[in-house]
């Protein structure tokens, strides 16, 4: 089963359902990607910060070697980390990430956060994480415009087919669109029934940016990180509304949450270690929720953001 695609403003087709690599363990990553390709996944959403790009590349190389897929059938996404926002740092780190994946180009390369941090030499620590070489949170001086101009040059040099942004506010998107020579193809944001970000989603879509949701299952991904508001929030899988809609359609709560997004044209990037759930997560486009059900799920919005630097004890108040 393959995922339907959405046409990006860059002209390329992007699968509506992909496999997210955040928190995928290094020792299982290659196998998980290989099996996901076998199940029909074609989009893989990685990042420098996830620390598993080498293993992800190994899984892809094996799948290509075994004839499961061709490179041009895959849609590989990675992200520019905060420590590399200076204009002259963008291309070198992108090339390093491409080498880690073992590929010549990214289908989509994204600015991970609208935060410039002080440069950390990859030879000193990689991935660098949030702290500088002094083990402190130190901000850099690069503007978004400087970073975006360097991102555009990646497209010119065919290192990235499309470029995008993540964790940007509507105000930052507005500003970026004033000077962008190449418009961002996508906006990736935390999006689930507890955090619908309706105005931001509508604005991005109106401007022709495809929205991708991460953390579609709400607090679930953040429990093991001991993020307090995630620990305090009722799991969406167990919410009576989500469960009753799932039972009515003969689906799982996870499928309902994913379909709530994809039915509104929002791409999703769930992950699962379970082969059955891997298959189920891909099956979230060929059936429909009723309009009233979508509205009811959206009504669960509580403005609850789980992926916030402040929640990890880092003073970067961007939200």
Swiss-Prot record:
Report which residue ranges the record marks as coiled coil: none
User: Which terms under GO biological process does the entry name?
Assistant: arabinose catabolic process; D-xylose catabolic process
- Which enzyme type, at the first EC level? oxidoreductase
PROSITE patterns tied to this protein: ALDOKETO_REDUCTASE_1, ALDOKETO_REDUCTASE_2, ALDOKETO_REDUCTASE_3
Query: For binding substrate, which residues are annotated in this chain's numbering?
Result: 112
Q: Where is the active site?
A: 50
Which GO terms label this protein's molecular function in UniProt?
D-xylose reductase (NADPH) activity
Described by its record, this protein's role is as follows: Catalyzes the initial reaction in the xylose utilization pathway by reducing D-xylose into xylitol. Xylose is a major component of hemicelluloses such as xylan. Most fungi utilize D-xylose via three enzymatic reactions, xylose reductase (XR), xylitol dehydrogenase (XDH), and xylulokinase, to form xylulose 5-phosphate, which enters pentose phosphate pathway.
By sequence similarity, the record places it as follows: Belongs to the aldo/keto reductase family.
Listed name of the protein: Probable NAD(P)H-dependent D-xylose reductase xyl1
Q: Give the organism, scientific name.
A: Aspergillus niger (strain ATCC MYA-4892 / CBS 513.88 / FGSC A1513)
Gene encoding this polypeptide?
Answer: xyl1
């Amino acid at each position: 089963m393959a995922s339907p695609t959405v046409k990006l403003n860059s002209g390329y087709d992007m699968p509506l359902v992909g496999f997210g690599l955040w928190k995928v363990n290094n020792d299982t990553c290659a196998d998980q990607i290989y099996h996901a390709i076998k199940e029909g996944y074609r989009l893989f959403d990685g990042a420098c910060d996830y620390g598993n790009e080498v293993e992800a590349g190994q899984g892809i190389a094996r799948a290509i070697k075994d004839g499961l897929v061709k490179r041009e059938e895959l849609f590989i996404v990675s992200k520019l980390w905060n420590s590399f926002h200076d204009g002259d740092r963008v291309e070198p780190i992108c090339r390093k990430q491409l080498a880690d994946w073992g590929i010549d180009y990214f289908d989509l390369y994204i600015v991970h956060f609208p935060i410039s941090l002080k440069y950390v030499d990859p030879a000193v620590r990689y991935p660098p994480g949030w702290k500088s070489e002094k083990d402190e949170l130190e901000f850099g001086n690069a503007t978004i415009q400087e970073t975006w101009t360097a991102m555009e040059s990646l497209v010119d040099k065919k290192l990235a087919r499309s470029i995008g942004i993540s964790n940007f506010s509507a105000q930052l998107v507005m500003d970026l669109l004033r000077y962008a020579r190449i418009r961002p193809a996508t906006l990736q944001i935390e999006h689930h029934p507890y955090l619908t970000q309706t105005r931001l989603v509508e604005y991005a879509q109106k401007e022709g940016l495809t929205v991708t949701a991460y953390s579609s299952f709400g607090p679930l991904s953040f429990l093991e990180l001991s993020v307090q508001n995630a620990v305090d929030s009722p799991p969406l899988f167990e919410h009576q509304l989500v469960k009753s809609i799932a039972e009515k359609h003969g689906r799982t709560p996870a499928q309902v949450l994913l379909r709530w997004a994809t039915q509104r044209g929002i791409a999703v990037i769930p992950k699962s270690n379970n082969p059955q759930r891997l298959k189920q997560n891909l099956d979230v486009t060929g059936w429909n929720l009723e309009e009233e059900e979508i509205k009811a799920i959206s009504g669960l919005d509580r403005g609850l953001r789980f992926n916030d630097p402040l929640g990890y004890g880092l003073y970067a108040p961007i939200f």
